[in-house]
Amino acid sequence: MKQSVVTIYGRGGCHLCEYVVNLLVPQSDQLNIEINEVLIDNNKELEDLYGQLIPVIHVDGKYFSHFRLDLEEFKSFLEKHRQHQ
């Protein structure tokens, strides 16, 4: 199974962003995911896109969710996503 890249767009000091990262990191080996954190603080384009929505979560470049992460929903999304690759 190919490893998926999970990108979390957030800001420094964002507690929801930290929560999402801390929820996924312990699952990364089991779920075969690489976690990529992107801070939007100094990027006007990303700030315009995601400024009020962080954390924003993408899987292999495809939008999954924003504000929160339900681990079971994430696992289901990941499984369906991989079936269509």
Each language-model region and where it sits:
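Short helix-capping segments at alpha-helix termini
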Residues: 28-32
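A short, hydrophobic beta-strand/beta-hairpin element that forms part of a small beta-sheet core
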Residues: 55-63
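Local sequence-structure signature of Cys/Sec-based thiol-disulfide redox active-site neighborhoods
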Residues: 2-26
